[in-house]
Amino acid sequence: IYVGKLADVKIQPGFQRMMIKGSMKYLATAKTCIIELVGYDKVFTTDIDRTQPEFSYEIKDVEEGNYYVKITTKDKEGNTSLSETYNVDVYGTEHIATYYPKRITDIQFVIADNSLNLIWNQADNVVEAIVKYYDSNEQLLTLTVKGDAASTNLPNWKATSILTVETRILPSETALDIVSLPISEYTLPDDPIVEIPRTNFA
């Protein structure tokens, strides 16, 4: 006697974790779900809760790498379903280190209003960048820049102060966790020297 299988299974990768989700539409008699990380000697057993809209189970503290996940359901008599195996790539520190941060490639002074334009590179998988800098009153300001932004204007800034950029990435569309890359530091320029025309002086 075979028990119904977990249907429409999706395994989302996270930072050293994974989330298993699926439909319980065929689990009329199933009581427990058995999840095995093939080749790692790790087996997890969890009760099936039909009061929830879908099945979900999180596996934490997993080393980054590629995993084959075998899923089986079992009824109260010990009968099991046919097992299904799925593949997932869990990411960690080493994988995150392969991504490029959002960087300032140029800082342009705007004479008209004494502001600065920050010119950005284009980097893959960037969700946003958190920019922190000091204004002319030495107040620390925080600015969130969209991942695909080409430039950002700073209307009020302190000359020769430090500006920091924290890049936040999502490794894939199905990834669970947004991860921060190491913070980059930049020194803002000095106030430009404006030469006064001498034509009106004797």
Name what the model sees in each region.
Residues 1-28, 79-124, 174-201:
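Pro/Thr/Ser/Gly-rich low-complexity, intrinsically disordered linker/stalk tracts
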Residues 11, 26-65, 130-160:
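Recognizes extended acidic, P/S/T-rich segments that occur
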Residues 21-23, 36, 58, 70, ...:
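Beta-strand residues in well-ordered beta-sheet regions across diverse protein folds
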Residues 17-19, 43, 67-70, 96:
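Residues in flexible loops and secondary-structure boundaries
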Residues 52-53, 66, 101-104, 161-165, ...:
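Short C-terminal domain-edge/linker segments immediately following a structured domain
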Residues 57-90, 151-188:
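Beta-strand-rich modules
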Residues 104-184:
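Solenoidal tandem-repeat scaffolds enriched in leucines and small polar residues
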